Design a protein with these regions (language model features):
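Hydrophobic helical h-region of N-terminal Sec-dependent signal peptides
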Residues: 10-14
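His/Met- and acidic-residue-enriched segments that coordinate or traffic transition-metal cofactors
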Residues: 3-7, 19-184
């Protein structure tokens, strides 16, 4: 069975939908404290965890597509994903600099690693199609995650970060949709 970005993105969206009910989940119980002593709520903690998890995944998947993509458009998009996610991660780290650490993510690591491994073993138009389809699904799920943080997060710094970053995610989605349309 082939695990792809669609599977990972679906898990991300479904997990986000369950946040309000996850009061016994480790991430919900483990509230990180902000600099002011106000604890990060479960939504903020989940947001940080998922955003932190997405960065290495996007960088790794992007590097595979950058090296093996068959068109300049795919390679350019992959290069954008690598550089953009490194920049976004640096911005998130700056926001979190004076906050207590958030527990490391565990749920999706294996799924993301499997997806990157699948891409590494693909080539040609199959790799291009799977990478682009996965990007469309990932960017939709990522936009939903950021919108959820903006609407429901309690940490003002994280909400501002999400508000400033969401337009970039929407741009990434628009570019991925354009690549997908070009394949048809």
């Amino acid at each position: 069975m082939k695990v792809d970005l669609l599977t990972a993105a679906t898990i991300l969206v479904l997990s986000a939908a369950l946040i309000p009910f996850a009061t016994n989940a480790p991430a919900a119980r483990t509230a990180a404290a902000s600099e002011s002593g106000t604890p990060l709520g479960p939504v903020d903690t989940y947001f940080v965890t998922q955003t932190s998890l997405g960065t290495p995944f996007q960088v790794d998947a992007g590097r595979v597509a950058l090296a093996k993509g068959t068109t300049q458009a795919i390679r350019s998009y992959a290069d954008l994903m690598v550089s953009s996610h490194i920049t976004v991660n640096d911005a998130l780290l700056a926001v979190l600099k004076n906050k207590a650490p958030v527990p490391p993510p565990t749920l999706l690591k294996a799924s993301y690693a499997t997806t990157v491994s699948s891409l590494q073993h693909e080539s040609g138009s199959t790799l291009d199609a799977d990478y682009v389809r996965g990007q469309v699904n990932y960017q939709k799920a990522n936009a939903a995650l950021y919108e959820y943080e903006i609407a429901n997060g309690t940490d003002p710094d994280l909400k501002t970060f999400a508000q400033e970053t969401l337009p970039k995610i929407q741009d990434h989605l628009a570019r991925a949709l354009k690549l997908q349309a070009a394949e048809k």
